[in-house]
Each structure stands twice: as C-alpha cells, then as structure tokens.
C-alpha cells in the first residue's frame, strides 16, 4: 500500500511524475480547480467583509471522494499543483475540500518535471503560501465583481451575452485607441535621395544616401526642396571625406519568458497566444518519447523571469563547448533585463535537458510540438553563447556643401547566430565593405535615384505586439495574456485578419460605453497600479481585503450611475423598407457575430437573410452608384460600391461627396480632417462643424 499521496493538476502529469517515484507513492490528479465561486451569483458576501462563497465545481464530487479516500490511507499528502499563485490556490482549495490534516499535508513545487526536480521538491516540502493564495483570491474576487456588476449592465444597455473584465476591457481600449490613431493619421510626404558612384578599380557601383550638411541632418519634405538640392549639386565634384572602420557586436537574446515566447511564436510560427500556451503546457507536462517513456521537455511555462539556474547554465555552456567549440560559449556574463513587474519566482523557459536535440525527438512529437520545442531549445542555447561580431565601415562623401553617407557591415564571427536568428535579423549591407576607398578619393557620380514616400500610420496590433504592450504597461501577468486576447476575440469585440487585430462595431460600442461609464476600469495607469498592489498581496506587504474594500465602493457607485444615466444602444431588430422576396414581409436588421444583416421576421417559417447595405449618401467614385458600409467576414468595417462585384471600389476610410479641389479625386474622412484619397496629391483640409 502506498504511504504517500501526491496530487498534481493534470492527468498528463500523473504519468510523468509517477515514474520518478517508487511504489510507496500514489500519484493522482485534481483536473485543475476543484472549488470556485458559483456561476449563478456573484458569490461574494459584501456584508461579511467580501468573504468568497466557494462551492465544489460541478462534476468534481466523485473525483474529490476518490482523493479523500486515498488521502485518509496515506501517511502524508503532497500537494504538487503548478508552481504559481494559481497552483498555490488550487492546493489550498484541495486542502479544504479534502479536509486534510495540516500535520500530514505538505506543499511541493518543481519548475520542471524531471527526476531530479521532483525528488528535490519532496526534500524541500513546505506549508502552503497563504500570501500567494490571498493574491489569487483578490484577483478572483475583483474579476468577479467587475464581471458580475458590469456585464448585466451591458446586457441591459446593448445586448445580452456581452461581458466586461478587469483586464480584457483595458486590452480592448488599447486596441481602440490604436484604431483612433490610425483613423486620424494624415500621411506626410517626404523624399529620399541616393547617389550612385563609380569606385576606382571596382566594377560594382556604390550607392550612398543623402545625409544633409556636415552638421545638419536634413529631411527632404517636398519635390520643390528636392529639386533645389539637385540644382545645387549640379556640376559639383565628389570626394571621400571620412572613412571609419570598426567592429560592432550583436548580443545574444535572453531566454524566453511567457511574453517573449508568445511574441516570437506568433511572428515566426504564426501561432496564436492560446495555441502557444496549449503546446507549451503539453511539452511541460510530458510527452511520450520513444525509448524513454513520458518526458517533461521544458521548464514551467508561466514566468516573467529570464533567470537560469546555475546547474542548467553550466550544462548548457559545456554542451556548447563540445558541439560548437570553446570560442562560442559565453563566459558566465550576467544576462539581465530591466523589466517592469518581474516576479522572478521561476526560471526562464528552457529545455529540461539541453542535450535532447530537437532532431533526436522529432518523430515523437507532433509537427507543432516540434516547432515550438525547437524554438525554445535554440533560443536557450543561443542565450548562453557569445555575441555575433560584425566588421563595419562608415563613409562620408562630400559634394559641395552636402554630405552623402554609406554604411556597410560584414559578419566575421557568427556567435549565437550559428544557432538562432530572429525574423527581423538585420541583413548585411554592401557586403563589399566599401573596398578601395580612402579619404580624399575622388568619385565619379553616375546617377541620382530619388524616391517619393509618405509617412505610415501606426500598425494595427497583432497578438504579439499586444502582448508586448500589455507587458510594458504592466497590464496583466504571464498567465493572463493569452486568455485575455482569446476572450475579446471570442466575444466578437475584436476581429483577427492576417495577424492584425481590428475593432468590430460591437467592440466599438462596448469600448465607448466602458470609457464613458467606467473610466477608471479601462484606465491603463489605474489597472497597472492595481496589478502592483496585487503583487504586494502576493509578497505579504498588503492585505487582500484592504484592496477589495477600497475598490468596491467606487465600482458600485459607477454601476448605479450608469444604470440611471446611460442611454441604450440599439443593436436589436430595426424594420427596413426592404421587402422579403420569399414572403413579402419587411425585412429587419439583425445583429450577428459579424455585424448587422437583414433577416425576415417570419423566422422560422421564412429563413431568408441577406447582407445589410448601409448607404452613406455618397456616389461611387468609379461608377456613380451608391457607396455602402460593409463588413469583412471578421467584422472589420469598410466602404464599397453597392454594385460589387461588377464595381470593385473599396476604401477603409469613409468617402466624402466633395471632390478634391487640388486634383479632382475623391476625398475621405480622417478624424476631423478631409483628406485626398490619392496620397500623391496630399491635399488636407479641416472639416467644418456642420459637416
């Protein structure tokens, strides 16, 4: 009979952990949380100092009965849930649900599921950390209060099925603010000027970029300014004024945190944050490897630390020396990143065994598991390697009073780049390294190459860039990035198209209402400050009840004011003059996942539907028919011709009736300005108030 009971979170871990412990140990799984707040009510006793009313999660009764039985037989119960605040809370809930005797109950954690880590955790068994439990309780209670107080208001004022959240609503606002920036952006013209020179003794010409004057970098804002510069350069001689040679290094990247793994997997593997976390969980919990059984392949996946244990660091450097040569292994330099809100409770994400090369286990992994493991392995190995070294040359070329410059670089030692290069890895420029050039060398001008450009608006957020922004602003924590993004997409507040995130019409309505009624809830600084407070609960310096007590009155007051003052936003059925061709009824406007559409009110007898074409009172610039507001399949708004597909007119900005006085083309609305749709024209005017 087993003397000891070890309870882990997932059944997948049972198999991995069991093989490291002898027959004296029974390993069982809780299948995640066993107690939670009830779904049917807020579940917080406001009058009793915000005491949570926990209940057993439906369907967990039989599992808990089995665990109770096993716990009674065991001499000692080890609670081995995940090594974070969520895992700490699950252990605490288990202790309550199983009525565990404190004398025979111990908490163990391991950052990786390996034999050494599991056995070591038992040697260092401890009590449950109630500070971490209280932090999780505070987060759960705050999230529940926001959700249960505000969501019904959204149902009442907009439509049923909507939700608000302490972190998700801020993320939605961040996306909305970026869309406002993009919509209000006015492109500005600028020009670049390159000079192409013949180098003495070289067949390949040299291209240099216009810099300006010796002590003044110049920006060429117009064709007129370009023509003036070209006129002043007419007939001048060109001479090399300065040649500087040197070296520069490119440092190895730090090993992955949760955030940087999500960002890099999104950029290089095209994985959503949710997919990355699901695969990383599988790699952490254990995968069946041929000849080795179930093996945990990576360390714990929810971390904001770039720290690596001394043992793992030494093993990695030894591996690098053996496989790549001593010159590639870094010499123990400290690799630290100054980042906001780093808890440093865990190591960075790394392989559990650096000698387990991706190629050796490829056959045992799914394609996506392999790709993610390979990314983590390469990044970790690279982080323990020396920087890449480039030989550089910078040249200044004088022509009259103007300066042209050229910079070149050549990789002379690949360092960490022998293992790992990022998507945006800089490319070697002018690989000639500008040979044969010395100061005072006379150069012959072959040609000028001038190009017109326009400044670009800020980019739409992607999952990767949103995670980066949330982390930089201190919004959310490693465990919340993926579920936050998943929720706002699932709620149809945000649409994802070709990696970009766009606010839907529904998202705009919800975001505007949240900003108006609950400005502090969606305020970035307020939310970041709250996150810091919650972290302090976790380290024992702030009482969680104090945080909740201070938060609730303002929330309650704002909800009451919104119930009274906020107007309803009608997204319900609206009768139109469009006749259903099947039954003759007037069709109504319905609101679906992708926005509005026309439906027959005779449903279910008549199931006729068609796209809703909202006319904006502007003739199509191409064919003269009506321009209508449309939606992409994902819910992003655009303007197109009602005669599509026969007419392919399309604009992301709202077209205006007024013609451009400068070129005669059509104008579009951008914030409070009227802008010519032809960026080469560049006409901009302020809208009048009556417009």
Question: What positions do the PLM features span?
Answer:
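Basic, low-complexity terminal or inter-domain segments flanking catalytic cores
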Residues: 2-5, 16, 25, 151, ...
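Conserved short loop/turn motifs at secondary-structure junctions
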Residues: 82-83, 159-163, 245-254, 264-272, ...
């Amino acid at each position: 009979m087993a003397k000891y009971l070890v309870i882990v979170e997932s059944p997948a871990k049972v198999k991995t952990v069991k093989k490291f412990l002898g027959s004296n140990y029974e390993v069982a799984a809780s299948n995640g949380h066993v107690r939670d707040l009830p779904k049917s009510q807020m579940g917080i006793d406001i009058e009793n100092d915000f005491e949570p009313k926990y209940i057993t999660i439906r369907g967990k009764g039989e599992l808990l009965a089995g665990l109770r039985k096993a716990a009674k037989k065991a001499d000692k119960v080890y609670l081995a849930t995940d090594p974070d605040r969520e895992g700490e809370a699950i252990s605490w809930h288990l202790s309550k649900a199983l009525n565990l005797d404190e004398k025979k109950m111990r908490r163990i954690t391991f950052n990786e599921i390996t034999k050494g880590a599991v056995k070591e955790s038992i040697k260092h068994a401890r009590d449950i950390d109630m500070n971490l439990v209280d932090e999780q309780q505070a987060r759960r209670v705050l999230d529940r209060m926001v959700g249960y107080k505000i969501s019904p208001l959204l149902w009442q004022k907009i439509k049923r099925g909507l939700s608000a959240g302490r972190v998700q609503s801020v993320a939605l606002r961040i996306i909305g603010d970026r869309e406002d920036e993009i919509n209000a952006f006015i492109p500005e013209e600028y020009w670049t000027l390159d000079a192409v020179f013949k180098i003495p003794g070289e067949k390949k010409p040299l291209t240099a970029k216009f810099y300006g004057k010796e002590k003044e970098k110049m920006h060429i804002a117009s064709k007129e300014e370009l023509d003036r510069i070209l006129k002043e350069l007419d007939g001048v001689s060109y001479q090399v004024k300065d040649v500087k040679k040197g070296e520069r290094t490119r440092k190895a990247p730090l090993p992955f945190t949760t955030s940087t793994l999500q960002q890099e997997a999104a950029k290089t593997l095209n994985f959503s944050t949710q997919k990355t976390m699901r695969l990383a969980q599988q790699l952490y919990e254990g995968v069946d490897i041929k000849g080795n059984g179930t093996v945990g392949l990576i360390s714990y996946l929810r971390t904001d630390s770039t720290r690596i244990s001394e043992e793992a660091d030494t093993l990695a450097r030894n591996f690098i020396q053996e496989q790549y040569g001593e010159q590639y292994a870094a010499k123990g330099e400290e690799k630290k990143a100054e980042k906001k809100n780093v808890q440093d409770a865990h190591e960075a994400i790394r392989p559990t065994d650096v000698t387990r090369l991706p190629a050796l286990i490829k056959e045992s992994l799914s394609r996506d598991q392999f790709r993610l493991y390979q990314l983590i392995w390469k990044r970790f190995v690279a982080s323990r390697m020396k920087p890449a070294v480039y030989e550089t040359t910078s040249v200044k070329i004088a022509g009259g009073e103007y300066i042209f410059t050229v910079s070149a670089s050549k990789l002379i030692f690949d360092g960490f780049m022998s293992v790992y290069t990022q998507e945006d890895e800089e490319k070697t420029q002018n690989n000639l390294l500008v040979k044969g050039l010395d100061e005072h060398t006379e150069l012959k001008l072959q040609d000028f190459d001038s190009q017109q450009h326009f400044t670009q608006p800020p980019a739409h957020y992607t999952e990767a860039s949103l995670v980066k922004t949330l982390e930089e602003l201190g919004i959310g924590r490693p465990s919340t990035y993926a579920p936050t993004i998943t929720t706002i997409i699932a709620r149809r507040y945000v649409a994802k198209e070709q990696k970009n995130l766009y606010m839907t019409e529904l998202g705009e309505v919800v975001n505007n209402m949240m900003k108006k009624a609950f400005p502090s809830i969606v305020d970035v600084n307020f939310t970041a400050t709250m996150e810091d407070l919650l972290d302090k609960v976790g380290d024992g310096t702030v009482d969680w009840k104090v945080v909740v007590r201070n938060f609730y009155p303002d929330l309650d007051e704002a909800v009451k004011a919104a119930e009274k003052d906020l107007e309803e936003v009608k997204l319900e059925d609206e009768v139109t003059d469009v006749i259903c061709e099947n039954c003759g009824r007037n069709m109504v406007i319905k609101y679906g996942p992708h926005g509005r559409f026309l439906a027959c009110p005779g449903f279910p007898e008549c199931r006729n539907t068609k796209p809703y074409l909202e006319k904006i009172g502007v003739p199509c610039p191409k064919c003269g028919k009506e321009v209508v507001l449309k939606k992409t399949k994902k819910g992003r708004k655009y303007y197109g011709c009602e005669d599509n597909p026969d007419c392919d007119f399309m604009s992301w900005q709202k077209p205006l009736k007024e013609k451009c006085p400068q070129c005669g083309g059509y104008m579009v609305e951008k914030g409070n300005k009227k802008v010519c749709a032809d960026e080469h024209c560049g006409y901009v005017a302020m809208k009048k108030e009556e417009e």
